[in-house]
A protein has these predicted regions:
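Short alpha-helical donor nucleotide-sugar binding micro-motif in glycosyltransferases
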Residues: 148, 271-274, 281-286
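Carbohydrate-associated surface elements
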Residues: 41, 160, 180
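Short hydrophobic beta-strand element within catalytic cores of glycosyltransferases
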Residues: 311-316
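Conserved acidic donor-binding segment of nucleotide-sugar-dependent glycosyltransferases
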Residues: 327-339, 347-353
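Nucleotide-activated donor-binding/catalytic signature segment of Leloir-type glycosyltransferases, i.e.
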Residues: 254-273
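Conserved donor-binding/catalytic core segment of Leloir-type glycosyltransferases
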Residues: 155, 206-231
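N-terminal subdomain of nucleotide-sugar transferases
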Residues: 1-55, 374, 384, 394-395
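Aromatic "clamp/platform" in nucleotide-sugar-dependent glycosyltransferases that forms part
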Residues: 294
């Protein structure tokens, strides 16, 4: 099958969508499919294809994290996509490149698959002042309803995506395809004891201290402020448990000040942004992954931590019900309150080495089917369904 993946950002940028698209591309290529990635590139002034990637001219945007923003319409881009002769067009974002994918699918009479990766209601504060959030939400819902209705098939990494589409008036069912992780890169067998020791030395963490980490971009939607508040209310220095916040973002300064104001700055480490290829020893040097975020659909950072053996403590999410990623007693625990979070942290800290080894093995086992092959298989089945259901298209 010939598949065109449309994404606003791609390597060398790193975010959840980029990671998902890269793993999907790798899995599809391994299965013998042909893949073209169509992406914005603010470093070029003309369209060109290299190594299976169609680079599209774009303008660098400070508002969108320094990524490129491309025009949705380009005859040259359409011609290059047409030359690829795609059987399926699969869009992963909703802006210039995503709209370009919708336009190309319509012009070329190709089935369109649309993956919703982000709960955009949680991100509207980036583009609209507080007093206009209600209006912005309505406009956003109208826009995403158009996108959803344009697609032949919808996918999303968690049941929360189905809830969102139903809320905005899209009647189609969502094919839930969990996110994937590069299992080999995060295997604890490939991370040396020296690299793990170096992490603790760098941040002056004693050997008897347990480290709970959160990994992600530091924006309000990640609820790290809630995590800090929970920490201040329930964890003391005598617990010998530290919180390591790995990542950078627009509210990092606010969070660092919050930790000081709460009097917990001696128990909290802010590493700032860390290159993705340097992340494996960061995860492996910690003991547990903890998050209070309710905005994630299916956290790739959490999966990466689990691939290194980190049990997860996650705040209960009524919409997501967490059933797709965290299973109590198998690979982590769901908490409903700061007290429950603290109790689980202390319980894990007090496990014997044998008990901890069994738990870590269970965590790793739980993500063994979360690699590139599984993602490609799930997605290929959706492509087959889209081709069967689309007019003027023959299933391959």
């Amino acid at each position: 099958m010939r598949i065109a993946l449309f994404t606003e950002t791609y390597l060398p940028h790193i975010n959840g969508v980029v990671t998902h698209v890269k793993i999907l591309r790798d899995g599809l290529l391994q299965q013998g499919h042909e893949v073209l990635v169509v992406t914005a590139d603010y470093q070029t002034r003309q369209h060109y294809v290299k190594d299976g990637i169609l680079h599209c001219p774009a303008i660098k945007s400070k508002r969108f994290y320094g990524y490129g923003v491309a025009s949705p319409f380009s005859r040259r881009r359409l011609k290059l996509v047409q030359d690829f002769r795609p059987d399926i067009i699969h869009i992963h974002n909703e802006f210039g490149i995503g709209l370009s994918g919708i336009f190309a699918a319509k012009q070329l009479h190709v089935p369109l698959v649309y993956t919703l990766h982000t709960m955009y209601d949680d991100y509207l504060y980036y583009v609209a002042p507080r007093h206009l959030l209600r209006v912005a939400k309505k406009i956003s819902h109208d826009y995403f309803r158009l996108l959803g209705n344009a697609a032949t098939e919808l996918t999303g990494p968690s049941p929360k995506c189905q809830e969102y589409f139903q809320q905005i008036g899209v009647k189609k069912a969502v094919n839930v395809i969990p996110n994937a992780v590069e299992l080999d890169d995060f295997s604890p067998d490939r991370i040396s004891a020296e690299n793990k020791s170096a992490f603790r030395r760098r941040y002056h963490i004693p050997d008897d201290v347990m480290v709970a980490c959160f990994v992600g971009r530091l924006g309000h939607e990640k609820s790290v402020d809630v995590l800090l508040d929970y920490w201040a209310r329930t964890i003391t220095p005598e617990d010998r448990i530290m919180l390591c916040i790995i990542g950078g973002g627009p509210v990092q300064g606010e969070l660092e000040q919050q930790a000081k104001d709460l009097g917990i700055d001696s128990m909290v480490i802010f590493t700032g942004a860390v290159p993705h290829d340097q992340m494996p020893p960061y995860y492996a040097s910690c003991d547990v992954y903890v998050t209070a975020s309710l905005s994630d659909t299916n956290s790739i950072s959490m999966l990466e931590g689990m691939a290194t053996g980190l049990p997860v403590l996650r705040r209960y999410d009524a919409l997501n019900e967490n059933v797709d990623q965290v299973r109590n007693g198998v690979n982590g625990y769901i908490f409903n309150s700061p007290e429950e979070m603290a109790a689980e942290l202390r319980r894990i800290k007090n496990l014997s080495p044998e008990q901890l080894s069994i738990l870590k093995a269970s965590v790793i086992e739980s993500v063994k089917r979360s690699g590139a092959e599984a993602l490609a298989n799930y997605t290929y089945n959706v492509y087959r369904k889209a081709m069967a259901n689309a007019p003027n298209s023959k299933e391959k």
